Amino acid sequence: MIQQQTTLKVADNSGARGIMCIKVLGGSNRRYANIGDIIVASVKSATPGGVVKKGEVVKAVVVRSKKGVRRADGSYIKFDENAAVIIKDDKQPKGTRIFGPVARELRDKEFNKILSLAPEVL
């Protein structure tokens, strides 16, 4: 469960290292985001020379969550960390590489470019 003030690791090479959730998109008073949901976040730490700078406000999609998601067969998929990928307004990732595994649930939300760049889809 990602909510306001939650810090997430960035799982791409856009230049950001860590972000903090400002808002969960999808409703006027929506509180929690899970895998596949879009959030608005502030960049808290960034690598020098990256596309994204510290202090920027960006949109990101959650790709890993400690809370996890329940699948149709009754199983749960959970990760060791909360991670997100920074995206543009057209749902395409800003970076050109994705680090770490991502969940298959991103396919339902039509983030196919992220799935094709990811080294492992669970």
Curated annotation (Swiss-Prot):
Annotated keywords: Ribonucleoprotein, Ribosomal protein, RNA-binding, rRNA-binding
InterPro entries named in the record: Ribosomal_uL14 (IPR000218), Ribosomal_uL14_bac-type (IPR005745), Ribosomal_uL14_CS (IPR019972), Ribosomal_uL14_sf (IPR036853)
SMART domains: Ribosomal_L14
The keyword Aminoacyl-tRNA synthetase appears for this protein: no
Domain of life of the organism encoding this protein: Bacteria
GO biological process: translation
Function: Binds to 23S rRNA. Forms part of two intersubunit bridges in the 70S ribosome.
Protein name, as recorded: Large ribosomal subunit protein uL14
Lineage: Bacteria, Bacillati, Bacillota, Clostridia, Eubacteriales
